[in-house]
Amino acid sequence: AMLRGIPMHFLPRFDAQEVIRHLPSVTVMMGVPTFYTRLMDTPEFTRELCAAIRLFISGSAPLLAQTFEAFFAHTGHRILERYGMSEANMVASNPLDGERIAGTVGYALPGVTLRVCDAEHNPVAAGQTGVLQMRGPNVFKGYWQMPEKTASEFTEDGFFVSGDMATMDGDGRVRIVGREKDLVISGGLNVYPKEIEDAIDVLEGVNESAVIG
């Protein structure tokens, strides 16, 4: 956008009224999920206000399926959720042209290879939960002056171990289910807080939940 001279609005902090003031003059908005829930709680945020918008993008935190569906009902727009991290920038995205599925972060970006593996770095079957690993030109080379940590975070074949638990379906669509360190073992079963939160969040009267174990 900057190279093409496209005007951009950088706000010092999120303020729903200030965002609403700018919306009629912009075509793309990027934000975290909380921005979108707060906008929907603001009476002035209407479908008509979004008439000029081509695309709403979400990242930096998981977008609840309920927020995705509520935003679509409110505005007619399906938020494009994507996934990345400081060590790799963006690695996956729902398609710009194509189906955007609530609760997923889409497919690996061009040039990026993603896989879901077990604790021994062996790829798991489609639909099974494991640790998301990534490889590509966007992935960093290592932690500054921390060779031991760098070695522990990369596999022998050059994949960075993200620490995010995920599933990947047969066509490569990725769903993030939690963090590896958040795993709770109950009755011999692996339980991920995100899975419990998803079950609670669909209950009537629940806007959002947080599970800590």
For each of these PLM feature ranges, what is it?
Residues A65, R115-Q133, S152, M168-D171:
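Conserved beta-loop-beta connector loops within the AMP-binding
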Residues E44, A52, G111, K149, ...:
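Glycine-centered tight turns that cap/initiate beta-strands
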Residues N94, G106, A125-A126, K141-Q145:
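Active-site glycine/GP-rich loop and adjacent strand/helix microenvironment
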Residues G103-L109, P123, F154-D157:
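Short Gly/Pro-enriched turn/cap motifs at secondary-structure boundaries
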Residues T42, D157, I200-L203:
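Acidic-histidine catalytic/liganding microenvironments
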Residues I6-P24, V191-I196:
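ATP-dependent adenylate-forming carboxylate-activation enzymes
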Residues L3, M8, L23-G31, M40-I101, ...:
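Gly/Ser/Thr-rich phosphate-binding loop
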